[in-house]
Amino acid sequence: MKKLCPLLLILFALYGCVQTSNKANKKFSNVQQENFDNMLARNRDKSYRLGNKILEKEFNDSVKLAIGEYMDSVKLFINWKAKIHNINSMELGESVKLSFELKYTPEQYREVSFDVDYLLSKDSLDSDKIYNTIKRLNNYSTVYFDGFIRREANGEACYSSYSDDIMHSYPNFKFFVVDINTTSKGDILSDNLQYAVNLSFKAIEPLELSFKKKMSDKETKKRIAEIAPQFKTAKELLTQEEKEYVDRLTQALTYNFLYAE
């Protein structure tokens, strides 16, 4: 028994080191944000090992498409943490364009940015959650946000940065924001809201396919007629704040295919 005691102490000490190491290696409490950032870090590391411009272009194009496909898989980023920068607004006729950037810096010499343009009517300035949250913030404030990366017409992720030379170390994505808060709300949506969100993506699909001339008008109307009653019932189960969340999401999803280049 006396021989076992030192051994147990060593094992406990090693276990404690492993636990501490795992926590130290984690950059984010949000698992979804951690996984996405790890993917970006791997892409950055791979980009350093490419031997010529042809390989670089092929790799960069594959990354843009892979991130677009990644967004098809995860649908929404939920409760990600970042600093807000460059808050601004501009009047456009009867609308206001709110613009800002969301940035996080996971390590030295690497920064991830999301470039947001949020359009709303002047009539909704007093009631719109995004606008009223943003206008009370100072630049560099910490925020928690939901949303998704915009995509090009070919399915690639849409970048704001003009040079592929920095797309791995300093990626800057064009982004649709759906929710923003000054405190964490948790990384999981309520069951009712998640169901309505899933239906939102399902409902927008026939509209997008019709817009791209990939679905007939007859099939589009049929698909919409099938989804509409489910969507209506799902929204009736939501709180008012959740209904507004879904409205912002469906608007962003519509803009995503209408203005894809």
Feature locations, PLM:
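Sec-dependent N-terminal signal peptides
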Residues: 6-9
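OB-fold and OB-like single-stranded nucleic-acid-recognition modules
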Residues: 19-261
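C-terminal motif of bacterial Sec signal peptides marking the signal peptidase cleavage site
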Residues: 14-16
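Positively charged n-region of N-terminal signal peptides that target proteins for export
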Residues: 1-4
